[in-house]
Regions:
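Nucleotide 5′-phosphate-binding alpha/beta core
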Residues: 2-159, 166-203, 209-216
């Protein structure tokens, strides 16, 4: 005769505590609140990214996009020239509907790049912000050589899986990379709550601490 196991009294963790545990786990990805920019506020601010009131969400979105448009316009010569050809400047973005005016670079652009040292120059030309000194060894470096040299200099070169036959490469500063990684992780654990709360927390802990997210 089989004995019935006593029911276990499992207490569900509250969503507030769930997010607090997550933020504690990924603290190194969160900049001090006093240093938050509008994009930081949009990503780190909402406790639940899927339940932000529409009016508040549109305000966060508008401020973040306008800030980043101005940032790329002023700190990326290639994008600045592209916007001037389209006759669009940050001063033209005054209300939410103006977001549609912001020039977008086609994804195919990031798949069209040269080889060797010319690839390094290509990465530098599409980067937004101050470009640190990058030392590349060898006369004919391959893609990995160039990427590793950039990463060692403070860049984070993200790239796609290349399933289409060619990788997409996008160079970022470490802070921009961190905010994107945080957003991916927070969205995943928020969607999983409460069904897989403990499992997802363990997965994200392994991802962050194991360095999987740092592969780009």
């Amino acid at each position: 005769m089989n004995k019935q196991k006593p029911e276990q009294n499992v207490q569900m963790i509250s969503f507030d505590d769930y997010i607090k545990k997550f933020d504690k786990l990924v603290q190194k990805y969160i900049p001090p609140k006093k240093d938050w920019t509008p994009p930081d506020q949009a990503v780190y601010g909402p406790k639940d990214p899927f339940r932000v009131p529409l009016k508040e969400g549109k305000e966060l979105q508008f401020n973040a996009i306008k800030y980043q448009f101005k940032n790329h316009y002023e700190n990326n010569n290639m994008y600045n020239s592209f916007c001037k050809q389209m006759n669009i400047a940050p001063s033209d973005i005054k209300k939410y509907d103006d977001i549609e005016k912001i020039p977008l670079i086609p994804g195919e652009f990031y798949k069209d790049y040269p080889n060797g040292r010319d690839f390094a120059m290509w990465l530098a030309n599409i980067f937004t912000g101050h470009i640190p000194q990058v030392k590349i060894s060898g006369k004919n470096p391959n893609f990995d050589d160039v990427i590793n040299s950039f990463n060692a200099s403070g860049f984070v070169v993200s790239y796609s899986s290349g399933t289409s036959g060619r990788h997409t490469f996008i160079p970022r500063d470490s802070r921009t990379f961190d905010i994107s990684e945080y957003a991916i992780a927070k969205n995943s654990i928020t969607m999983a709550y409460p069904v897989c709360s403990q499992t997802m927390m363990m997965i994200n802990k392994k991802l962050f601490h194991g360095g999987i997210f740092n592969q780009g």
